[in-house]
């Protein structure tokens, strides 16, 4: 399965650079190992979440909920893929 997720600008470049290899997310999407995610960079703005046009894809390699609040999971990501910049 594929998931499209928002990611704040302050974290996005660290994912691109390989410094961040996990995401803590609310598990409202029933994530599974092997699922793919596309992270869409942006920031909250006056008209909702404002996207920059940069996206990057990855694969979920491990899921754990140890030590997290109920309903949250830590998604380990790998196979960080293509960075797309779309200014439109």
What are these regions (language model features)?
Residues 1-88:
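Catalytic phosphate/metal-binding cores of nucleic-acid and nucleotide-processing enzymes, i.e., regions
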